[in-house]
Structures are given as C-alpha cells and as structure tokens.
C-alpha cells in the first residue's frame, strides 16, 4: 500500500520542467514507457521473426518446386498420352469401318483420365501450399505469443517485490474463498 500511495504523492508533486527518465513502477507506466517497451520488443523480436519467416519461405518454395516437378512429370505423361492418342487415331483411320465408336471411347477415356490426373495434382499442390501456409502462420503466432508471455512474466517478476506478491496472493485467495462461499 505504501508504494501505491507513494506513486500518488509523486504524481501530486510532478515538476513542470523535469528530466527524462524511465518509470519502473508498472502501475504508474506512461506513454513513453510503453513506447520504449514496444520499441525494444520490435527491435529484438524482428530478427527472430524474420528468421522464422525466411525458414517458412524456404519450405514453401521447396514445396512449390516439388509441385512443379510433379507437374512436369504429369506433362510428360500427358505428352506420352498424346503420342499414344495419335497412334490410336492412326489405328482408328484403319479400323474406321469396323469399330469407330469403340476407338472414340478409348480416346475420350485417355483424355479424361489425363485431365483428371492433372486436376488432382493441381488440387493436391494447392492444398499442400495452403496447409504449409497455415502451419507457418500458426507457428509464427504461437512463437510470438510465447515470446510475449515470457517477456510479460519477466517484466512482472522483475517488478514485483515480496510484499506486493504476498498481498496479491492473499487478495486472490480471498476472491476464491468468496466464490467457494457463494457455491
């Protein structure tokens, strides 16, 4: 209680032209202290965040490269299917009189199968990119949250003295006791 009243007395005797300094009392922080804390967090946190984002970017680029390689393989399969289709068309000219409709069905089946394969690979690539992006964003959020919590705990631990700590514990026990009493 002495620290709290001391803070109010200090505010009552605020000098009109004083020196610049940091206020270490967490209950009496001001805009300058908050700006300094945010600046320090940004200064030290941006390197870690940049590294995380660079790692994620490399993973995503690797996934894109893998997807492109799969796409190239599929295009090669498509080209082989087109060559096969050309052969089938040549055979169709020879057998036109006997089985034109059956050859046409095989042609459509080949085109449909290749088209479905391409669509599935494209869908798979897009889903992989989406999930990698979501995972990267979740990991960055989680690490940012952990850093913020660690910073807040460090600030609280450095600012709490033993007397204030015991008063806070007693007040919380009193609140919990009141809650239990109401039940």
Curated annotation (Swiss-Prot):
<dbReference type="GO" id="GO:0045259">
    <property type="term" value="C:proton-transporting ATP synthase complex"/>
</dbReference>
<keyword id="KW-0547">Nucleotide-binding</keyword>
<keyword id="KW-0812">Transmembrane</keyword>
<protein>
    <recommendedName>
        <fullName>ATP synthase subunit b, chloroplastic</fullName>
    </recommendedName>
</protein>
<dbReference type="Pfam" id="PF00430">
    <property type="entry name" value="ATP-synt_B"/>
</dbReference>
<dbReference type="GO" id="GO:0009535">
    <property type="term" value="C:chloroplast thylakoid membrane"/>
</dbReference>
<comment type="function">
    <text>Component of the F(0) channel, it forms part of the peripheral stalk, linking F(1) to F(0).</text>
</comment>
<comment type="function">
    <text>F(1)F(0) ATP synthase produces ATP from ADP in the presence of a proton or sodium gradient. F-type ATPases consist of two structural domains, F(1) containing the extramembraneous catalytic core and F(0) containing the membrane proton channel, linked together by a central stalk and a peripheral stalk. During catalysis, ATP synthesis in the catalytic domain of F(1) is coupled via a rotary mechanism of the central stalk subunits to proton translocation.</text>
</comment>
<feature type="transmembrane region" description="Helical">
    <location>
        <begin position="25"/>
        <end position="45"/>
    </location>
</feature>
<keyword id="KW-0472">Membrane</keyword>
<keyword id="KW-0066">ATP synthesis</keyword>
<dbReference type="InterPro" id="IPR002146">
    <property type="entry name" value="ATP_synth_b/b'su_bac/chlpt"/>
</dbReference>
<keyword id="KW-0138">CF(0)</keyword>
<keyword id="KW-0406">Ion transport</keyword>
<keyword id="KW-0375">Hydrogen ion transport</keyword>
<comment type="similarity">
    <text>Belongs to the ATPase B chain family.</text>
</comment>
<keyword id="KW-0813">Transport</keyword>
<comment type="subunit">
    <text>F-type ATPases have 2 components, F(1) - the catalytic core - and F(0) - the membrane proton channel. F(1) has five subunits: alpha(3), beta(3), gamma(1), delta(1), epsilon(1). F(0) has four main subunits: a(1), b(1), b'(1) and c(10-14). The alpha and beta chains form an alternating ring which encloses part of the gamma chain. F(1) is attached to F(0) by a central stalk formed by the gamma and epsilon chains, while a peripheral stalk is formed by the delta, b and b' chains.</text>
</comment>
<keyword id="KW-0150">Chloroplast</keyword>
<keyword id="KW-0793">Thylakoid</keyword>
<dbReference type="GO" id="GO:0005524">
    <property type="term" value="F:ATP binding"/>
</dbReference>
<keyword id="KW-0934">Plastid</keyword>
<keyword id="KW-0067">ATP-binding</keyword>
<keyword id="KW-1133">Transmembrane helix</keyword>
<dbReference type="GO" id="GO:0046933">
    <property type="term" value="F:proton-transporting ATP synthase activity, rotational mechanism"/>
</dbReference>
């Amino acid at each position: 209680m002495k620290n709290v009243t001391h803070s109010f007395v200090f505010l009552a005797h605020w000098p009109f032209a004083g020196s610049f300094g940091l206020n270490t009392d967490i209950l009496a922080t001001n805009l300058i202290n908050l700006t300094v804390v945010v600046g320090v967090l940004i200064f030290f946190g941006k390197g870690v965040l940049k590294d995380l984002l660079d790692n994620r970017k490399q993973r995503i680029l690797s996934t894109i490269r893998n997807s492109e390689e799969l796409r190239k393989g599929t295009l090669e399969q498509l080209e082989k299917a087109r060559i096969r289709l050309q052969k089938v068309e040549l055979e169709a000219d020879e057998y036109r009189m006997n089985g034109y409709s059956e050859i046409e069905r095989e042609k459509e089946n080949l085109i449909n199968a290749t088209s479905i394969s391409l669509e599935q690979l494209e869908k798979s690539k897009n889903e992989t990119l989406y999930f990698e992006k979501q995972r990267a964003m979740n990991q960055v959020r989680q690490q940012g949250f952990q850093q913020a919590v660690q910073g807040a705990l460090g600030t609280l631990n450095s600012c709490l003295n033993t007397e204030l700590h015991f008063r806070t514990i007693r007040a919380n026990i009193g609140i919990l006791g009141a809650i239990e009493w109401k039940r």
